[in-house]
Amino acid sequence: MSQNTLKVHDLNEDAEFDENGVEVFDEKALVEEEPSDNDLAEEELLSQGATQRVLDATQLYLGEIGYSPLLTAEEEVYFARRALRGDVASRRRMIESNLRLVVKIARRYGNRGLALLDLIEEGNLGLIRAVEKFDPERGFRFSTYATWWIRQTIERAIMNQTRTIRLPIHIVKELNVYLRTARELSHKLDHEPSAEEIAEQLDKPVDDVSRMLRLNERITSVDTPLGGDSEKALLDILADEKENGPEDTTQDDDMKQSIVKWLFELNAKQREVLARRFGLLGYEAATLEDVGREIGLTRERVRQIQVEGLRRLREILQTQGLNIEALFRK
């Protein structure tokens, strides 16, 4: 980009909230940073993405957004003013011209529990929010403002979606303070700090620290080995109170044959997507992203085809007096 890229200080612990619990944008948290060689190289790769005919969904997306030209400072102010007045075309232009900014920021959050396309999708929501609230008369560039919103939506998604049990955002932020303090103490003390040591460092009650740390305990997988010399997993010793008998198994086989017959009443694309998503016709059940990668479509397009296919299948099943929800669990 011709303008400076922007760096936003870590806002997880310092963010302020209004009376409705919505984070308040902090202009003081923004610092301009000259673009690095890596950033410039990444920009060049993104611009070349449109010419690469690769089936990988991420590369396809990068190619698509490569067609959108960047805005000059003057164009940015022009379109931002029109967007504030409700001009839909200007709003869309602001969004499309900054999609590469979202990709660059999303890549910094790799290996945090979410796939890159999911990070980009969350970041795009932040970009849309930034376009809706940006006031060009405030004196700073749009990328400054948008970076803050993009990072907030991505970080919140990581907090929410990478936990088996979701916690309120204010609890997650407080927990992060305790965990960061625990990491710092572990380096100083050469051992894992106790709740008492963390509480003393933060001047907090020990009971509060212990309660918060328990929220971070991991859920044990039923596939995890029991330990010792045993090769059995927890799942192997749990009784299945709902195990199907012979009659149920026969009914299930008949139902599977019927599902295959109904699938072939869909068009080829709908049939393939549903088969890959739900593990039918010899396929293993797969995520939207994995299906998109296999058949050369974006995650969003796969989702749309799935919705269309399920809608058509629902119509077919209704004529049989059946409910599709009993067949597919998403």
From Swiss-Prot:
Provide this UniProt record's keywords sorted from A to Z: Cytoplasm, DNA-binding, Sigma factor, Transcription, Transcription regulation
**GO CC terms in record:** cytoplasm
What name does the UniProt record give this protein?
Answer: RNA polymerase sigma factor RpoS
Q: What does this protein do?
A: Sigma factors are initiation factors that promote the attachment of RNA polymerase to specific initiation sites and are then released. This sigma factor is the master transcriptional regulator of the stationary phase and the general stress response.
Annotated region (Sigma-70 factor domain-4), positions in chain: 262-315
What HAMAP family does UniProt report for this protein, alphabetically? Sigma70_RpoS
Stored Pfam families: Sigma70_r1_2 (PF00140), Sigma70_r2 (PF04542), Sigma70_r3 (PF04539), Sigma70_r4 (PF04545)
Q: Which domain of life is it from?
A: Bacteria
Q: Which PROSITE patterns match?
A: SIGMA70_1, SIGMA70_2
Q: Which residues does the annotated region (Sigma-70 factor domain-3) include?
A: 174-249
The protein's GO terms of the molecular function aspect are:
DNA binding; sigma factor activity
Q: Where is this region: Sigma-70 factor domain-1?
A: 56-89
Task: List, alphabetically, the InterPro entries matched.
Answer: RNA_pol_sigma-70_dom (IPR014284), RNA_pol_sigma70 (IPR000943), RNA_pol_sigma70_r1_2 (IPR009042), RNA_pol_sigma70_r2 (IPR007627), RNA_pol_sigma70_r3 (IPR007624), RNA_pol_sigma70_r4 (IPR007630), RNA_pol_sigma_r2 (IPR013325), RNA_pol_sigma_r3/r4-like (IPR013324)
Give the SUPFAM superfamilies listed for this entry.
Sigma2 domain of RNA polymerase sigma factors, Sigma3 and sigma4 domains of RNA polymerase sigma factors
Instruction: Give the residue ranges for region: Sigma-70 factor domain-2.
Output: 94-164
Keyword Ribosomal protein assigned: no
Under PANTHER family, the record lists:
RNA POLYMERASE SIGMA FACTOR RPO, RNA POLYMERASE SIGMA FACTOR RPOS
Describe the protein's quaternary organization and the partners it interacts with.
Answer: Interacts with the RNA polymerase core enzyme.
Q: Which compartments does it reside in?
A: Cytoplasm
GO biological process, any: DNA-templated transcription initiation
| DNA-binding region location | 288-307
Family designation? Belongs to the sigma-70 factor family. RpoS subfamily.
Name the residue ranges of motif: Interaction with polymerase core subunit RpoC.
118-121
